[in-house]
Amino acid sequence: MIVAGPGSGKTTVLVLRVLRHILVDHLRPEQILITTFTVKAAREIRSRLIEWGEALFEQARTEPISQADREFLAHVDINRVVTGTLDSVCQEALGSDRHADEPPLVTLESFAASVILQRRGGLGASYRNNQAVLGAFLSPFTLDDDPPTTLAEAANTLVPIIDRFIQDRVDVVSFGAADQPEAHRIVSEIDATYRRYLRENNLLDFSGLEEALLERLRARLVPILLADVRAVLVDEYQDTNALQEAIYFELVEACQASFTVVGDDDQSLYRFRGATIELFRAFIDRCRNRLGRAPAGPLYLVENYRSTDEIVAFFNAFVRTDPNFGPARIQPPKPVIRPNNGQGQVPILAMFRPDSQTLANDLTDFIEAVFRGGGYRDPQGRLIDDLRGNAQAGDLGDAVLLASSVLEMQKPYFGNPPKARFTHHLRNAMAARDMKMFNPRGRSLRDIEHVEQLLGLVLLSIDPPDRPGGSLYSSMAITNVAKFFMNRWVAAAQQFLQTNPRPVYGRTLAQEMSEWRDYCLRGIGDKASSRDWPFLDVIYGLIPWLDYFEIDPEGQVYLEALSRAAGQAAGFSAYRGRLIRPQNPGSPDDHGRLSIEAIIRDVLTPLAENVIDVDEEIMPSVPRDRLNVMTIHQAKGLEFPLVIVDVGTDFTTNHQKNRFRRFPEQPSSTAMIEDLLAPFTPDLGALRTQRNGLDRSFEDLIRLYYVAFSRPQSVLMLVGCDKALKWTSNIKNVALGWRQDESWAWRDQSPQPTGRRLPVMVSPPNLLFV
């Protein structure tokens, strides 16, 4: 058990331990399994393994080694180390063991699971028949504590609970027993119907995928990919859930493998995905009880090689600010992180302004000076040196803006247009200086101009308004929200067509669309030679006239999301995401017409209802010429020379709607789900509820900003609005040093008033306000 603080070289330790297993223990690479929490982390480990491993093996071959060692090295292929997220390993392991006569398993994205839950999982009928009961049950888990108003909202609220049934290994029979509340019985019946449908159709959601591997391991039917594993190494173990813990224990026991876990309880961020920090804190006892052996450790990695002395001192002080957080950490208390960077002398910077617009403009001035000008010079001369990007290759990609949310627009309320948030103002301010930012999560897919144009062109191609009887989507039983956005997409496409897009390779956009219309409406034309076409072909057929999706990094991420939505339809949609050539175009029962309706209902409607997430991890690296904008969760495991942390641009009043993001008054919805299920998970529930739900909610906020403050290598800057710094402020915010007992560390550390007049602002000595 290795407890690795931020910047302490845990990736290096994992890679060297793998190489030690190969060179010292003579394990073949394919006998070693490493799991990581993100795809990006897996890529980094694989890259280092290849780079360092090949160099070490080449050097070893030049040494006077035994003939047996020489023969061993001749057959070593470092590429065969099994590396990936646990989900990807499960997919590969189960897929490679499939017999030729078995249908392939299809893994569902969360939006597809939500759709199936509504239509095939019994939620639709149960919600209609028991709306009051289910609404009361689900309301504590919604964003605003109100009952879901639509079936889609009910499904999105219920999915995390049903996922937890598997992730937490809940006794669902007891949960839905006759002596439990009626809502419990209804939910357990929905879960049973949903799981049965998935089994009968060879579908798996991600929790079901992991459960399938666990069942194989328990039956000692170890998949071929893992059958010869002799060493298991797990990164970010603090974010493991009970199901994943069971998989690791079963695999280690079945294969008699060595077992190494690396993690940090202070950096656990994924409670909302089922992560259970208590499993890491209690790892030694749980390992002893389950495997009969106590692991070595905990071994502490406390030398920080990433950050300057000032940054390490800042995040060390932050994590110890609230004494109520102490009992939530590994006991006995672990050593304090020590700086080993050898650089420093730049204090923690703080930029606070009256409003987010002014802040965006001033921050853009700062960024431009650092990366496009001669460097940032403090007007008052408080910095020893100017701050400037690397002279050889420095660019905007060396900086990142981190925030709990990176959305650029607030949600619209009561029919009013949405208000711009800080990130939107920053995008515009940077664009005015000919600088760009990379924030694919900042805007909903349905609202992005180029996405609107593409989806509008798609609708005009397969469901044009001149169809006899009008377009299909306008009369379908889909939500008014979906119809609103589809109408908007069509209008955007029509406006785009008026610009007369240039031909591509001698072919016009009008020709491409006309061929799809001929096929979909009448079953004629060049495309009629095929009985059916994948819907993806329509999307990619239109891309040449919208080169934004090919050349812009954000556009590439958006195109992947659209493609994923279309591809997922193959797993659950009536026509598997394909357009069928019509045989009787005028008939409402024609398969061509029905296949178009299936595409509209199962692909375009989820996009219009904003339930498709982007996945920027498809980008092998972030663009060097853009300012990265990430949620703190996304930045886990990454590092940047300059890190700007938004600690409260949204919080200009003490509004109750945003308190859960800064100073919760009640347990988070995730903590309440944990408390709900605790009585039905005897092992996990007792461990988890040693701390109450409100305490756990505060812990999550402290860990979130601890991770943010420990990302920078050279410079950390906090940004926010002035109102939060007023001496008399009631805008309590964990990120600004507020403790759970409502005392304020930043105010305590500021020069104290000597007379009746109070200072206007707090001014903690460890911050340099610019």
List each model region and its residues.
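P-loop NTPase Walker
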Residues: 1-101, 223, 230, 285, ...
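Conserved helicase NTPase motor core
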Residues: 1-9, 33, 41, 82, ...
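Inter-lobe coupling/hinge region of RecA-like P-loop helicase motors
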Residues: 1-6, 30, 73-74, 79, ...
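Conserved RecA-like helicase ATPase core segment
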Residues: 20, 242-353, 743
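Conserved helicase core region in the C-terminal RecA-like lobe
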Residues: 81-90, 232-236, 262, 605-660, ...
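Accessory C-terminal helicase-associated subdomains
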Residues: 184, 391-398, 402, 506-634, ...
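ATPase/helicase motor core of nucleic-acid motors
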Residues: 257, 286, 389-553, 560-563
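C-terminal accessory regions
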Residues: 491-501, 624-627, 678-740
